[in-house]
Amino acid sequence: MKSAFPLLLFAWLWISVSTAMAGPPQSVAELWADFDPRQEPLDVEVVREWKEDGGVYRYVRYRIGELKGKSAWMAAFYGFPEGAAAKLPAVMHMHGGGQRAFLEEVKTYVGRGYAALSVNWGGREMENAQPGDPNTDWGAVDPTQQNVPGYNSILPGPKQFFEDREDPRNCNWYLLTLGCRRGLTFLERQPEVDPDRIGILGHSMGGNLTMYVAGTDDRVKVAAPSVGGQGYRTEPHDMLGGLAQQERIQGDVGLFTRTLGFENYAPRIHCPVMHLSGTNDFHGWMDDVYRTNALIEGQPLRYAFSPHLNHRFIPEVAVTRPLWLDHYLKGGPALPETPRSEWELKMEDGVPVFRVTPDLGSWPVSRVDIYYSVDPDPRARFWRDAEGKKNGDAWEAKLPILDPGAPLFAFANVYHTLPKAETLPHLPEIRELCLSSMLHTATPAELAAAEVKATDSPATLIDDFTRGWHDWYRLNAENKQFWQFWTRKVTDPKWRGPEGSRLAITLTMSETNTLTLIAIENEWRSYRGKKAVYVCRREITGGSEPQTLVLEASDFLNAEDEMPLKDWSQLDQLGLCARYEENRERGQRPEPANWKGEIPEFRQIEWRPDRGN
C-alpha cells in the first residue's frame, strides 16, 4: 500500500506553521477544525486472526498518523460474529488507566451480536501477545501513562505535540482522542459493519475518552461512559473545612478549560448518553456528572449510580450499559425513563420531603431507594437511606437533618425488573436494572429561606443489620479469604463517634480467626488533614454464641508509624476485613487470610460511653 507519510508529514508541518502564525486554538471547535479522521489511509495490519465460539477475532494495528515526522500506531482487538447475514452494529471500547485492550469486552459484545473494537491506547502488552508482536507505538509523542504530567498540561515538551510553544494539542487527551477517532474510521470501513450504527464506551480514563470522542465526532450514535468524563475539574469546590480541586493545570488554565474541559465538549454531543458510576467515585465526581450532562441538549440521557461505591458498580447498574447500546444500535427494548423527582424544602414541620415517581409504564418497579446527604464532598459523603414509602404512583420520604447550616443533597435509585435475565462476565445472573433520578442540592441559604429546622439527633447505634448491608459496600463478599465490608456511616455527623466513646461490635464466628478492623481518617479530604489508615487486629475465639468486641480509639494503630488513633472525630470509613494490606506494592496479589470456617455474622455495631459514664 502506498505510504501516507508525505501527506501526513506535510499536514503536521502545515499545522505547526499555521499555529505559530495564528496562535493556539481557543475553543473545542478550533482545536479540532483541522483534523479529518477519514483523510489518510489506515494501513491496517492483521497481526493474528482466529475463530472462537462463533466469533472471528483479530489482533490488529491501524495507523493513527504521522506525528512530528514519525508514524504513530494503535494496536487493538477486533471481533465480529461469524457468518452474519446483514451489516452489524459496532462498538468501540476504550480502556481505563493502567489497563489495556480488553479481549473479554470484545467477546462480550460479539456474543451480543456486535462488531467490537477495543483499542490499546495505553500501550501495555496485549493479552496473549507473542514475542515480536507489534503493539501501540506513539512514535515521537507519548500520551500514555509513561508521561503522566501530560494529562494536565498544555506546555511544550520533548514528548508533546509541540516542543516550542504552549498549545492544547500538547495535552495527552488531544492525542488520545485523535487516536480513538481513527478507531471509528477503522470500524466504519470494516465490510461487516453498518457505519451508521456505531457506539462507544469506556471506564475511568476510558470514560473521559468516551466524552471527548462523542463531543468531537458525530459518527458516534450512542455513548456510555463510566466513572469519568465530567467537567469542572479545574474549579475549586467548597467543602466543609476547605476547598478541593480535581485537577491543577500546567499552563494557561483558561485555555485548557476552553479547549479540553468536558463542560465544553458536552454541548457538542449529539447522541444519547448513559452515564454509569458509583456515588462516591474519586474520578467522576457525582455532582459534576450531572452539571456536565445538563449541557447536552436535546438528547436522551440516563444516570445509574451504585450507592456507596467508588470506581465500580453493582450488577444492576452494570447491565444498563449493554441494554442502552442494544436499544440505540439494535432496536432493543427502550429503557425506562429517568425517574421524575422533586423535593419540597418548605414544610410546616421544617423537615424537607423528597418525592420520586418512576416510569410505571415500562418495566415493573421492584423497589425504590431515596438517599440524602449533608456532606458536600462527593467522594467521601455518606448517603443516608431516607426509607421512602409508596404514596400513589410516587415514593416519598422525609429528610430530617441535624444542622441547617450544612448543605443538603438527595437523589433516588429505582430498580426495574428486567424483561429477561441478563448475563455479564464475572457477575451473577442479573434480573433488575437500576436507574437514578436527578440530583437535588440546596445550600444553607436556601435551607434557611425555606425555614428548614434541625429536627434530627445523633445516634449511637451504627447498624443492627436488620436491613442487611444496605448502608455498606462489600468487596469479595463471598470469598472467605478476601472479604471486606465497608461503611462511610461514621463520617456522617449523625453517627460520628462521640468523644471518649468505644466501638462495640457484636458478632458470631464459628471458628477462631483474626479479625482485621480498619479506620480511615481524611480519605480524600486533604483540605481537612492528612489521610491516615489505622489498623486493629483481634483474635476472636470461635463459638456458636454472639460475643462483643469493645475497642478504644487507641486500639487502632497507624499503618505507617503505629501511632494510636486519638479519637473518632475525623473518620471517613470503617472496615471489617478478613485481611487488609494498605501498603501492598502495585500489582502484587494479597496473601490469603487463612480464614477458617464461615464469614462472621455481624449482629450489631454501636458506640458505647467511655468507662467513666
Predicted segments, located by residue:
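Surface beta-strand/loop "capping" patches
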Residues: 327-372, 384-394, 398, 451-456, ...
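Primarily recognizes the serine-hydrolase "nucleophile elbow" in alpha/beta-hydrolase
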Residues: 182-246
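Extracellular ligand-binding interfaces
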Residues: 479-564, 570, 577-612
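Cap/lid segment of the alpha/beta-hydrolase catalytic domain
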Residues: 101, 107-178, 230-242
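N-terminal cap/lid segment of alpha/beta-hydrolase-fold proteins
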Residues: 37-85
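Short beta-strand element of the alpha/beta-hydrolase
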Residues: 75, 86-96
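Catalytic histidine neighborhood in serine/cysteine hydrolases
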Residues: 296-312
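Short beta-strand/loop motif that positions the catalytic acidic residue
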Residues: 269, 275-277
